[in-house]
Amino acid sequence: MSRRILIAGNWKMNMRAESGASLAKGIVDAVGKSPAVEVVLCPPSVYLSGVADAVVGTPVELGAQNLYAAEDGAFTGEVNASMLTDVGCRFVILGHSERRQLMGETDACVAKKLHAALAGNLVPIVCVGETLEQREADDTESVIETQIRGSLEGLDEARAANIVIAYEPVWAIGTGKTASKEQAEAVHAFIRELLGKMFSTEVAEQIRIQYGGSVKPGNAEELLSQPNIDGALVGGSSLKVDDFAGIIKAAPSA
């Protein structure tokens, strides 16, 4: 079935208020009024409102990089789903490898955030991926399956079609290395097959699976042309208008 390509820019801990607003406006101009693909910008939480102002009334959507699973309360420094929707977010990135590695986030933690996101009418982008050591040990599929089953724990078939999976090989993030189109497609196909076993083939065909890992204008077309790659979660290349626009333009319209 046809799945609309989703290109999401993860700004990570970069930009400032003025430069972020300028970047967002530049991307809005580059995208135009009727893009063939869905475009999401995920700035640092302190700049969500400013970027929201820049994209309001345009096809470009707003996303967050994380959330806390609880509702209002004594959770200093945290931001919940209600707060994110309040400032205009529609998407939220969950379980990024940097948070798994640096913040000690577990699959169980990601699952709690997943359910909080869905309850708050956010579309979760759930990240999974293997390290170089795991790939070289031929453990990619077992690692991915463990992460997906754990991160989607308790998710029923009725809501499963509302999520996005992002496959981000850890060894390709910020390293300049990129999985070949064959490597990426093989893992994406495995993920879709796994989702079919967990839910149903029909639901698995609806779930978008992004690739993330040093996506650039120069490799975007060959990656996004693969049958099971439904978009990109873009890091460094989302910080420059021309680079991000190049990735968007490289995406097929189906």
UniProtKB/Swiss-Prot annotation:
Designated gene of the protein: tpiA
Species of provenance: Rhodopirellula baltica (strain DSM 10527 / NCIMB 13988 / SH1)
Keyword line: Cytoplasm, Gluconeogenesis, Glycolysis, Isomerase
A Pfam entry, by short name: TIM
Enzyme superclass (EC): isomerase
Top-rank lineage group of the source organism: Bacteria
The protein's role, per its UniProt record: Involved in the gluconeogenesis. Catalyzes stereospecifically the conversion of dihydroxyacetone phosphate (DHAP) to D-glyceraldehyde-3-phosphate (G3P).
Protein name, as recorded: Triosephosphate isomerase
Active-site residues from the entry: 96, 168
Binding site for substrate: 10-12, 174, 214, 235-236
Pathway: Carbohydrate biosynthesis; gluconeogenesis; Carbohydrate degradation; glycolysis; D-glyceraldehyde 3-phosphate from glycerone phosphate: step 1/1
A GO cellular component annotation in the UniProt record: cytosol
GO molecular-function terms, A-Z: triose-phosphate isomerase activity
Catalyzed reactions per annotation: D-glyceraldehyde 3-phosphate = dihydroxyacetone phosphate
Subunit architecture: Homodimer.
Family per similarity comment: Belongs to the triosephosphate isomerase family.
Predominant localisation class: cytoplasm
Stored HAMAP family: TIM_B
InterPro entries assigned: Aldolase_TIM (IPR013785), TIM_sf (IPR035990), TrioseP_Isoase_bac/euk (IPR022896), Triosephosphate_isomerase (IPR000652), Triosephosphate_isomerase_AS (IPR020861)
Location of this chain's protein in the cell: Cytoplasm
A single BP term in Gene Ontology: glycolytic process
This enzyme's EC code(s): 5.3.1.1
Keyword Cytoplasm tagged: yes
